[in-house]
């Protein structure tokens, strides 16, 4: 029951973050498209009330509807990697591969040594050892 509630809360949180990102992307695209929309106005003697309505209307219209055109615009807004530009630290970290281990089971090889230090048989009953009599114990 608790797992279901936590999963539902996590999904709600992630969807809220996604909608916030979409709204911010829509606002950014409105700001970038604003000079083009000013050229579409019929005349320069527009009163300030009409300009405010013109700016607020696209933000309200773009939030509920998502069309393929908007996705293409968002993809075009993303910066394209420049050939001469150095990759960022995250990209370098992604591209780096771990060096191959010295042996195939390099971590497993350490376990029997640790087990023997504490008197634990690593393989259980596969390799039974005779009980050693210790007269001082």
Curated annotation (Swiss-Prot):
Localization of this protein: Secreted
Signal sequence region: 1-18
SMART domains recorded: Pro-rich
GO cellular component: extracellular region
Keyword annotations: Secreted, Signal
Record's compositionally biased regions (Low complexity): 75-85
Major localisation: secreted
Region annotation (Disordered) ranges: 14-113
Residue stretches of biased makeup (Basic and acidic residues): 99-110
Entry-linked Pfam families: Pro-rich
Function: Unknown, male-specific function.
Protein's name in the database: SMR2 protein
Organism from which the protein derives: Rattus norvegicus
């Amino acid at each position: 029951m608790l797992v279901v509630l936590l999963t539902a809360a996590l999904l709600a949180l992630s969807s809220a973050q996604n909608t916030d990102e979409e709204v911010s992307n829509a606002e950014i695209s409105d700001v970038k498209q604003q000079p083009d929309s000013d050229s579409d106005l019929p005349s320069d003697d527009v009163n300030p009330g009409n300009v405010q309505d013109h700016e607020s209307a696209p933000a309200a219209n773009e939030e509920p509807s998502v069309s393929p055109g908007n996705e293409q615009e968002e993809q075009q807004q993303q910066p394209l990697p420049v050939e001469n530009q150095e990759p960022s630290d995250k990209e370098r970290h992604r591209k780096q591969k771990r060096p191959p281990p010295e042996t195939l089971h390099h971590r497993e090889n350490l376990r029997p040594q640790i087990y023997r230090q504490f008197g634990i048989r690593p393989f259980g009953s596969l390799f039974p050892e005779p009980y050693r009599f210790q007269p001082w114990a």
